[in-house]
């Protein structure tokens, strides 16, 4: 008598991916708190914050022999409880409709990200408010950017002024050469200034992370819409939302998520423009807006500049069928240049309008802050550090100190030029938005690897770009169909 075969349950790929990133996210969060914040100070400030909400005895029990704080522990417990529900839904996926399974999973992931990223960031914002301006925040992305907004409103050039008499100085002076430089571009403080004015007028204080959190939430939604299937939408939400490094950057307030938003917005608009063009509708306005968004990214941080060659190559390649008539290449190039300029000019104009006035105001100071400081040629340069080629320079003793100059530009050129050529060649053969992002990410990674510093926040940013690239390039699937995904995201 034959026995009925019962299939063995195997977790879906998205469940396994969520579990891996959830564990990584929690471990990194707790280690980051332990490394960056003195535990007694953390417990004291949390007790002050919750003095009227939780009994002191409960706080003491949660704080006993812990390297993190009671609120973070509760957020972690909620997140793992939600993951248990996720596993049950995944277990029952054959008994539930595809639409119901996707919607429940999507909502659970959103809630988990909300707990571990937005909830944790909200906690640090509140702790900073009851503690000190230099506490629970990144020095450059939060503290220094807030000071530049104050300089802006006072008519002071942030590229000329120093930051010795600001909360930045409380971080210490050894290797803190950013006290004499603002290494970011003007859009970082120009965009945030209205939020500063509204926040200080309404509640009396401001935290730059409010801007980052708002833009990160929009980034997650836009990134989901860049993909072509519900499975890809769920995957990009998991990896982007629980990015082991980028999520910590959002929590502490580094500004890579700010740059990421403008890039994702630009590509979302460009994708809409291409869809409109395929439907024989005029895509001009959407296309121009997409270039404006990328221009804003370029006016925020130099890491976005490496995207421009691939955007130019993509625009030229997609125009080529319109100008190719079997003639020689020189004629094709000359025929295509006016159209290329017409497509790219909003990006260039946006960058010039945002950065130009500051450059004209004091060009030497701006170049020194944005370029010479990171290149090691400023009077007070950035240190040699990170996870890239620079460690070999230190290991071989090629510099007397970590602040000394070494010609990393040679290594950068040796790595970046072939990567740029290969990326443009591949883009020419395989034109597509995912190919543009892929070439950008590989070129930026190669350049940063050979640079003076490959900081961990750059890797989180690169992981975000690679994540979007991967899921954008995934083939279309109708399990569940695109309408279900759109309904869940609505």
Task: Place the predicted regions along the sequence by residue.
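Residue-identity detector for glycine
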Residues: 284, 326-327, 483
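Amphipathic coiled-coil alpha-helices
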Residues: 262, 269, 286-288, 293
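Nucleotide-activated chemistry modules centered on ATP-dependent adenylation/adenylyltransferase
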Residues: 111-112, 485-489
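Short, Lys/Arg-enriched, Gly/Pro-containing loop segments at transmembrane-helix junctions
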Residues: 367-370, 476-486
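Transmembrane helices and adjacent periplasmic/lumenal helix-loop junctions
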Residues: 288, 292-316, 353, 452-458
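Primarily membrane-embedded glycan-assembly and transfer machineries that use lipid-linked glycans
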Residues: 2-109, 113-279, 313-456, 469-470
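Transmembrane alpha-helices of multi-pass inner-membrane enzymes
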Residues: 459-477
